[in-house]
Amino acid sequence: MPRKLLGVLLAMIAFCAIVRAADDPFLGIWQLNGEKTSNYQQQSQMIINVPAPGGFTSYRATIGKDNQSSTETHPVAFDGKPYQTTGGDAREISYKRVDARTIERTQNRNGKISVDTEQVSEDGKTLTVKQANAVRVYEKQFDVKPAKR
């Protein structure tokens, strides 16, 4: 993993450790499980979800099949409004909470709309992202808990 990307990830882990968080099962650090993932064009991806007003902020660090890295950030707010991503994969994203463990994500990439479902398992250890022709499976590496005072 490139040093710069590793540095960003370590900084986010430290940040997560001190942040107060609600009991949202999506919060934490998620690592792509390539063996359980189907039809995904990237070599690896880590998702870091940290608390933010109205939902959370999602940071995504990706290593492509060509070993090139990219990062992308976007707010996850459940207000139905589209928000622009920053970084590698430019698009607008809006979110709808289906239930406590399921969210629906609508993406607009240059006028092309796609919808996927993200669901956290009952035990909170697996995040599954279902798209039209792909399934990505992530395993929780680090759980964000409220800071003790």
Describe each model-derived feature in a short phrase.
Residues 1-5:
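Positively charged n-region of N-terminal signal peptides that target proteins for export
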Residues 21-149:
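Hydrophobic small-molecule pocket/channel-lining residues, especially in calycin-type beta-barrels
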Residues 7-17:
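Bacterial N-terminal signal peptides
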